[in-house]
């Protein structure tokens, strides 16, 4: 009998998520880059306990319709690559379709997005869809990530102190803000603007 087995999808997704999402700054980076790729010129990042408790990113980008909002949480689903030749002309920060599914499998995510005056709410916890409905929302996208690594305790123990997590996020936001001077960034931790 073979000792090598194919992992079930949930376990494989949790392991894969650990490659994309290592700490709080990884989540902030992926969400901010999605906002930039969506054409945002105003991005707000709100943290609770340096991102250890909650990360919320609000943008004024193009938003998503209901179909795209749910597809965004499927692995390898992307609006940025359609064919192999596109790999030679990547003009976006993200393109693999890995970030949102990876974040959603190790946390709880609430996405509110509006496109063409139609707003959608997606609620996912541990990779399981809990809610997919219409809602009231402002234009653009608001995504809230909480309970980070709640179901992967091995990863949870590798998170740094709140001070270290915050320092990494501040460093990333400073660098991305310098790279995109036409975008207004706002970073708030525990109601204190940084």
Features from the language model and the residues they span:
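N-terminal phosphate-binding caps/lids of nucleotide- and nucleic-acid-binding domains
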Residues: 2-194
